[in-house]
């Protein structure tokens, strides 16, 4: 009788991927990266185990936003003090902190659990073309579409 394969920490092989965000649309890039972080691009995907790979995103400052999202899309955060709500538009966030724009988008597509937090820690975003992970020998990843 065959049994369904269940991955565990001992039989997971993790790779490092480098993705160039220049000219890419925010949502399309984010959904594909979230899929890689979860491990859904592998045949050994197991929902309750972190089977995902490490992802390095470079040129985050050159990401594209379609339509009027730069002025209309608003990101909120709260300090947990009365009147402590802060808001910033996607355009301001892209100019001031493009890494956070991508991280927020991608981590919002991961599960809201301890497993999702663990998967989110395998994401590294850099605004420029340089990254300090050359020792891991990352492979270039070609996005679909």
Curated annotation (Swiss-Prot):
Keywords: Ribonucleoprotein, Ribosomal protein. GO terms for molecular function: mRNA binding; structural constituent of ribosome. GO terms for biological process: negative regulation of translation; translation. GO terms for cellular component: cytosolic large ribosomal subunit. InterPro entries: Ribosomal_uL13 (IPR005822), Ribosomal_uL13_bac-type (IPR005823), Ribosomal_uL13_CS (IPR023563), Ribosomal_uL13_sf (IPR036899). It holds the Pfam family Ribosomal_L13. PROSITE patterns: RIBOSOMAL_L13. Part of the 50S ribosomal subunit. Belongs to the universal ribosomal protein uL13 family. This protein is one of the early assembly proteins of the 50S ribosomal subunit, although it is not seen to bind rRNA by itself. It is important during the early stages of 50S assembly. This is Large ribosomal subunit protein uL13. The gene is rplM.
């Amino acid at each position: 009788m065959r049994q369904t394969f269940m991955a565990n920490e001992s039989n997971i092989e993790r790779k490092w991927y480098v993705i160039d965000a220049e000219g890419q649309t925010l949502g399309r890039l984010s959904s594909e990266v979230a899929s890689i972080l979860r491990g859904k691009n592998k045949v050994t995907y197991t929902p309750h185990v972190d089977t995902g790979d490490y992802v390095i995103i470079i040129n985050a400052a050159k990401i594209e936003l379609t339509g009027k999202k730069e002025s209309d899309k608003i990101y909120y955060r709260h300090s947990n003090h009365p009147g402590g709500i802060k808001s910033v538009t996607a355009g301001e966030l892209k100019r001031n902190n493009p890494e956070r724009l991508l991280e927020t988008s991608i981590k919002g597509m991961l599960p809201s659990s301890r497993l999702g937090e663990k998967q989110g820690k395998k994401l590294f975003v850099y605004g420029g073309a340089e990254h300090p992970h050359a020792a891991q020998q990352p492979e270039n990843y070609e996005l679909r579409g």
